A protein has these predicted regions:
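Alpha-helical support elements that line or immediately flank enzyme active sites
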Residues: 55-89, 131-151, 219-287
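Surface-exposed intrinsically disordered loops and tails
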Residues: 166-175, 182, 187, 217
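Flexible, low-hydrophobicity surface segments
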Residues: 1-175
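Conserved catalytic cysteine-centered active-site region
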Residues: 119-122, 253-255, 259-260, 285-296, ...
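Phosphate/diphosphate-binding loops
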Residues: 135-136, 288-313
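Non-catalytic, substrate/partner-engaging modules appended to enzymatic cores
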Residues: 10, 16-21, 182-186, 206-207, ...
Length: 313
């Protein structure tokens, strides 16, 4: 509109500090013009020879795994390899996510109950059972669907109250379903006898689980860098937490592991939890090739962290 020139928009720093100035956010121009590359954009620009990953995921919420047959998937077009838990263990990994248990006085778990790839049991809908690496995402997804998983289905608990009921089956072997308890902090006891029954109300309330519904898919990629380090790029907003959470599980010492935060779209907190980091890291170590993994929206909704529901009485 002629109100400003291009030169007027350029930040001109005076002094040694930008505190209290109109310093322009470094990503502003790219975001406004649509030229800011996010993780899924970076995945499209990976070098020739990059393998695209897809997951074989659980279609039930709770089950014992009786067998995993990858034969058909391994013979499908474009497939380079199918990775299961036994491959992670053969590569020196524990195949366990480290939950970094805090407040151990209140916790009844050591934090190692979650596998990177399920091999004995399914704990939730969408649990990863195998990773397929192929020349295209389409080939990888088709082969992931061809992995045959024989299961013994177990009772599914679709809310916390059902899961902690006295007769509920244990979900994680050796870990009580109500695995964390903390003190109830409240004021002094009230003399309810002084209030007529007609004036007393008991309320049971519930706040639902809230998916973050981010538009950018959960995505990441990895490679072995020039120093020989396993390098994972993701939307992590807890890099300092996610490295120790996955290192032992994939068999990579911390000093040989690097996680880089991609330019991220909205995460709204869901990427405080690791989602794809261990899967990508394990694939890079085993395959020794650059890889990428991009979720679709169904996977975003069913297999990433959520704001937890709450029950109150």
């Amino acid at each position: 509109r002629g109100e400003m020139t291009k030169e007027d928009l350029v930040f001109k720093q005076t002094g040694d500090s930008i505190v209290g100035t109109n310093y322009i956010r470094p990503s502003a121009a790219q975001k406004v013009t649509g030229t800011w590359d996010f993780g899924a954009d970076d995945a499209l620009k990976m070098p020739e020879g990059t393998l695209r990953l897809a997951l074989t995921q659980a279609k039930v919420s709770h089950a014992n795994i009786l067998s995993i047959d990858t034969t058909e998937a391994e013979g499908m077009p474009g497939v380079f390899r199918v990775i299961t838990a036994k491959d992670i263990k053969a590569a020196g990994g524990t195949n366990k996510i480290n939950g970094l248990v805090m407040l151990p006085k209140h916790n009844k778990t050591d934090g190692f109950e979650r596998p990177v790839l399920c091999d004995e049991k399914i704990f939730q809908f969408g649990d990863a059972i195998a990773i397929v690496a192929a020349d295209t995402e389409e080939h990888a997804r088709a082969a992931a669907d061809a992995v045959k998983v024989e299961i013994e289905e177990l009772p599914a608990y679709m809310n916390a109250m059902d899961a902690i009921a006295p007769d509920a089956a244990e979900i994680h072997p050796g870990v009580p379903n109500a695995f964390f308890e903390t003190n109830c902090i409240k004021g002094p006891d009230f003399d309810w006898d002084s209030i007529p029954d007609s004036q007393q109300v008991e309320i049971e309330s519930y706040c639902s689980r809230q998916p973050h519904l981010h538009l950018e898919p959960d995505c990441g990629y990895g490679y072995i860098d020039e120093d020989g380090m396993i390098t994972v790029h993701s939307k992590s907003i807890g890099i300092h937490l996610h490295m120790p959470m996955i290192a032992d599980g994939i068999g990579v010492p911390m000093e040989n592991l690097r996680i880089v935060q991609n330019h991220a779209g909205g995460t709204f907190g869901y990427k405080f939890s690791p989602t794809n980091e261990a899967l990508i890291g394990a694939a890079v170590k085993i395959l020794e090739r650059p890889v990428s993994l991009v979720f679709n929206q169904f996977q975003n909704i069913t297999y990433t962290g959520k704001r937890s529901p709450a029950f109150m009485n």
